[in-house]
Amino acid sequence: MVTKKAKLLHVLNNVYFKKTEPVSIVHFLTNRCNARCSFCFIDFDDPNTFKNELSLDEIDKFTKSLGKSLLNVNLTGGEPFARKDIIEIAKLYIKNTTVQSIYVTTNASLPDRVESFAKAIIDFDKNIELTFQISIDDMPEEHNRVRKMSNLFESCIDTYQRLK
């Protein structure tokens, strides 16, 4: 069994000398999103926008290729919880890499999925550091208007309450 000290030495060697393995990555899981934020860069009118998501098999191969220095992954998108397999994706990172923290950016429109994800990941690995960024741009009325979703602000608060 590899000790924490040995893992840290491997990461430090990679960061300062070899520089061949990532320490942190941002994985853009999907362009799909249930909001239509006025500032978003995703072109929802382009028919190719929602093509080319990586399959679980592709993500499995990808995570196995990342080496043993990965400490953090940021799962983002569109709305990462639009992918029903987000739990399996996170588990692949935990299983196939040395990731210690998972950071998820969400519009918090799907509180049930967010809560299920948090419970499943903590049950899978109690040592993983799990962080959520819930996007709130303004007071309730303006937040909902800009993101073109009614009750989204309230959903953000609901999601936060479930996670705390």
Over which residues does each language-model region extend?
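Aromatic side chains
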Residues: 39-41, 143, 153
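Conserved strand-turn element in the central/C-terminal portion of the radical SAM core barrel
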Residues: 104-105, 139, 160-164
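Residues within well-formed alpha-helices
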Residues: 89, 142, 155-158
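Conserved alpha-helical substructure of the radical SAM core
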Residues: 2-130
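Glycine-rich S-adenosyl-L-methionine
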Residues: 147-164
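Polar low-complexity intrinsically disordered regions
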Residues: 1-2, 161
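Conserved radical SAM core fold
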Residues: 80, 108-112, 133-149
